[in-house]
Design a protein with these regions (language model features):
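Elongated scaffold/linker segments in the mid-to-C-terminal portions of large proteins
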Residues: 9-31, 168-278
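A structural signal for well-ordered alpha-helical segments within the folded catalytic domains
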Residues: 35, 39, 106, 137-142, ...
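Proline-centered turn/helix-capping motifs that create local helix->coil transitions or kinks
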Residues: 5-6, 75-84, 206-207, 262-265
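Conserved, well-structured interaction surfaces
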Residues: 4-79, 95-106, 112-126, 278
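Hydrophobic face of amphipathic alpha-helices that form TPR/SEL1-like repeat modules
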Residues: 72, 146-147
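Short, surface-exposed recognition loops and adjoining beta-strand edges that mediate ligand/DNA contacts
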Residues: 1-5, 85, 120-141, 148-220
Length: 278
């Protein structure tokens, strides 16, 4: 930012595509989000599989396997070869071995495929009551995304599988585009959106916890504009050149903050003009 905010080496490395192994942002991605999530899924799966009610928990186990595969998908995409481990506990004296990107890709595809077989279709559930849990269609959509880059991950293209996964979702006739782009992101849509295939529900009464996107995408002064219970981190922003790429009347502009802004009481505050930001 022109104000000096977020002007640190980790961010600058990412913007310049010159990232070193000790980059703090990547360490956070790896050590705070991806692998703690994978580890939690391992523990939950092990607990359910050890339960005397295991046979009644097949769908829940499948759903957790899909969430774990989702974490491994991003780990594979970001880092390539990563430790592949599915046990509940890690032995500090026998750490998990690193698997090749292809091996992780094959694991992700297998887990998604087997999970989808045990999950209900969106056509089989009460959409409101089941929201926001995973359905077959949510997993098929994730698989389509994985197959899109199969040639990079495993050295072999899978374009036909991309089409097959998408056809599974489209064939339900359960989804359609919203009238406006922004309608997908309404706080009130919950299970009502016909476009959202999979979502992570966040309780607004818990503040920003679990939804860091809103924390990092808003200006600090938006706390007063929207009467927020927290102060946004003044994070992501865009350049004037990027803004000018949108034609007048483009409804996506409604999702962006630019130009003069106002507090709820009508008092104006002005966003800092950023010329060379990231």
């Amino acid at each position: 930012r022109a104000s000096g905010g977020w002007y640190d080496e980790s961010n600058m490395q990412i913007m310049a595509h010159k990232i070193t192994p000790d980059n703090a942002r990547l360490e956070t991605c790896w050590g705070t989000y991806l692998f703690p999530g994978i580890g939690a899924a391992n523990a939950v799966i092990a607990s359910m599989e050890a339960s005397p009610m295991k046979d009644d928990l097949k769908a829940l186990i499948a759903e957790t396997r899909a969430l774990r595969a989702y974490g491994y998908y991003y780990a594979m995409d970001y880092f390539g070869n990563v430790p592949l481990f599915t046990e509940a506990k890690v032995d500090a004296n026998d750490l998990p071995k690193t698997a090749s990107r292809k091996e992780v890709y094959e694991f992700v595809v297998k887990e998604f495929t087997e999970a989808a077989a045990e999950l209900p279709s969106i056509k089989e559930v009460n959409r409101t009551a089941y929201y926001p849990r995973l359905t077959k269609e949510a997993v098929y959509t994730a698989l389509a995304s994985v197959y899109l880059n199969a040639e990079v991950y495993a050295g072999e293209a899978h374009w036909a599988d991309v089409v097959t996964m998408c056809d599974h979702v489209i064939g339900t006739n359960a989804y359609s585009l919203e009238n406006k782009v922004g309608d997908c992101f309404l706080a009130t849509n919950e299970a009502n959106s016909t476009e959202v295939i999979s979502s992570f529900a966040v309780d607004p009464s818990k503040g920003v916890d679990g939804n860091e996107f809103i924390l990092y995408t808003q200006h600090a002064l938006d706390q007063k504009k929207y009467n927020l219970s927290f102060a946004p981190a003044n994070g992501y922003c865009f350049t004037d050149d990027a803004l000018k790429r949108y034609e007048e009347g483009d409804e996506r502009l409604e999702l962006l903050e630019y130009g003069p802004q106002y507090y709820q009481d009508g008092l104006r505050y002005v966003m800092i003009k950023v010329l060379n930001s990231y």
